[in-house]
Amino acid sequence: MQLKQNFLSSFIVILILLIAPPANAQSQNDLIDHIIKEKFRIGSSQVFTNEDSPISKNGKAESKLTNNSAADEAEPFIIVNPNDSSHLLISYINLDLASEIFNFPIYYSNDSGQTWNKSSFDTQEFYLDDPFPGFEIAGGGDPIFAFDNDGNIYFTWLYLAANFSNFETRFVVLWGQSSDGGATWGIQEGDKKYLETGGLDLFTGGTNEFGTGVFDRPWFDSDRSGGPHDGNLYCTGLFIPSTTLAMDTTVEQTAGMVLKRKLPSVDSFETSRTQISNGDLAQFGNIKVANNGTIHVVYGNINDQEVRYSTSIDGGLSFEPPSTIGQFSFDIMSTIILVNDRENPALSMALDYSNNNTYIVWNSIDDRVSGLYTYSQDEGVTWKDVQDIATLSGMPDHQVYLPNIASNDNNEVSISWYSLDSLDVGNYMIMHSRDGGKNWETPISLSDAVTDFSEYIVTNPQQQPPIFGDYFTSVKVGCTTYSVWSDGRDMNGPKIYVSANNFCNVLSNTSEITAITEDIQLRSVYPNPSKHILYLEYNLKKQSDISVSIYNTDGKLVQSYLTESIPAGTQTRSYDIHSIIPAAYTILINSEFGTITRKIIKQ
């Protein structure tokens, strides 16, 4: 494996030399270069190691998804079942170069994140069962979910494969479907399993003759309106046609931001694409389908540095001419890294399905990384003035890195982001609005330790920096916002963390988290409220050393208990809390399988 790593390192150097940016306007080749640098993965597990650095906990109640210490974890996506708010799914990039692992694990919960199960589906095993001869997985990303009204779940991901003997590549976007809540996944046979296939010509900086073309940054949503297009599954993305397709005069040519459709009861995506952008360089798209069936799409126009927005009311067969709703700075040819090598406009869109209010946030990269926000209260006809997220948060001197936005059906909106100082150090934050995004409450820190992005800068051209990903995501269910992000606090490479904030709860500045694992479950915390004794009921698949601590709402430790080795099975333990004063607290349970937190009341 070390030989492959060295070869890959040299391969990246060759890529940089082959696709050197020209000294003129940004072009399609520059965009392809940007895609190559994003999708090719070398990994960081052998570059950054510091296993002696403990992860401190101070009661903020955020937690790592897994007990993984070797792999990079990045680009997390979280979704909730629109017809069952207790049903959640998460996936992310999981890259462990030493173990030759590059997959997208799927975790699902049927109890609002109290317990988690891992799907049996392995994207890498599936791909390797039916590979392109002579091609190995060299990168990929973009794990995305969507639900339909019948409870079916759709999943898409992409792989970049390479033949290292001749520099040929394959760029394939795959999709699957689950009808059992995410436990198992069905994949179509033959070419039906591909949403799009293409390849990159590493010597010209364009596409090659394979397939139909490159389809990057796929984003899913489905029509759940009950209208004439109910059940349609839509996917937006950047499309660059293959050289073969580009020369085919018998088909309508599309390029830039496009939409692909899968109709209900059809087992494949249509081969056609609907043009959204006006032939411009377009990337970083998001799609949402409103409760009336209107399709909302937002993307970045690279050359004009504009946030563009468009809608479709005919099921994605056509789109209105895009309108400009904001600006950003982003030079895809720049070699200057401000925070992380994957900094990008990172557009994120949310809808309030009760009134179809539309909210959008994004990054602008100039001499610092800024976060911007706008919203529409008339289904995208007009937009409010763009606002600076750092200013809204009360921290105008801070950078806002990779913001994302979520909304419920009650005029409540949340924005999550990395708030970084001038040295690129900071916490992952969230702030909340209860009046449709007009006014914002004081931000809350979701992470209980800072990430120092400056420590992850790589100067050796034969190494890639650790993978944090191109975006993070969040979803809002009633009062609760679930946020997932890639956290680099322990200098052992980025790891996925998740937090759940209930903005209706009296403990509005804390979260409840359950580690995403099948090895430990906290079945019950009782009585709650409690005066003297608190009981915790565990279910363990195997023995574990468990430590329990209690923190106040300021994050200060008020009570800790001796670490106890608890055997496998269902076990109940009691904890004396008579000495702490009556108030609201967070109890934190640490195990080798992850961390669990719960809110408690001492009477």
Give the positions of each predicted feature.
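Low-complexity, intrinsically disordered segments with a bias for serine/threonine
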Residues: 13-14, 437, 534
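Extreme N-terminus of proteins, especially the signal/transit-peptide cleavage junction
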Residues: 51-58, 515-520, 541
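Bacterial N-terminal signal peptides
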Residues: 9-20
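C-terminal PAP-associated
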Residues: 26-508
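Low-complexity, Pro/Thr/Ser/Gly/Ala-rich linker/spacer regions in secreted
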Residues: 503-519
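C-terminal outer-membrane/trafficking sorting elements
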Residues: 2, 21-25, 517-526, 530-603
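Residue-level detector of alpha-helical transmembrane segments in integral membrane proteins
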Residues: 14-15, 136, 520-522
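N-terminal secretory signal peptides that target proteins for export/translocation
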Residues: 1-7
